[in-house]
Amino acid sequence: MKERYEFCVNGLNIQAEFARSDTRSIFIPLLKQLTRLQAEKNRRIAVFLAAPPAAGKSTLCCYLEHLSRTIPGLTPVQAVGIDGFHYYQDVLDSHTVYRNGEIIPLAKIKGAPETYDVKKLRGLLESLNGENQFWPLYDRRIHNPVENAVEIREKIIILEGNWLLLDEAPWNSLSCDYSIFLRAGDESQLERIVQRKMMGGFSEEHARQIVRSNDWPNIIRCMNQSRRGDLNLAYNQNGILEEI
């Protein structure tokens, strides 16, 4: 049996369903493990949750945050996405990358690893244990980051994104206390991305063009070039999560 929830993700209201069996066998034990880890380290800890585009990272993080605040004995977690570390649109429009023998504007591959300010992300991660920080948030309604939009306040921070476990420089210079990789890669993801882009204001035709030329290659790159996490999960054919 599944339960339905609604979360605000990057400025959009998203509905999600989670199986009760997944909650009992995976999510609650994970949160208990993170609670113990934070207590042992006696400091703020960073957890990476990496997965391909449209695998459900953001909604899963929101759900884990919800569970941690409603189940007694768990240390509350705070979910934060890395999309706020995108370069601004004017930077993407004015800079290029060399790929497959072509010079391509970064704006055409927005969402690819090259379109993030990894140095900025690494700097904030390295100072995570100091005073409460304010991190950027990506707003899909304006297609740009919003600075100082999220206060980092909890002792367990779950950072989610496509490239957090990418085994390529400079991404492989990032460090965390615990990592999770969620494997997913099928055609249904493309439809979810199309709908998400249309909710952000793109026409269906434009959304499908972007998804085929940009998002699908990102899915393949994430699946093939990412390191395994401390916990590795995948949905089976019945939509139930399994450890792999």
List PLM regions with ranges.
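Walker A (P-loop) phosphate-binding loop of P-loop NTPases
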Residues: 54
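Post-Walker A helix-loop "phosphate-sensing" segment adjacent to the P-loop in P-loop NTPases
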Residues: 66-78
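Conserved nucleotide-sensing/catalytic segment adjacent to the nucleotide-binding pocket
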Residues: 78, 85-139
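Small-molecule kinase domains that catalyze NTP-dependent phosphoryl transfer to phosphate-bearing small molecules
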Residues: 147, 169-172, 195-244
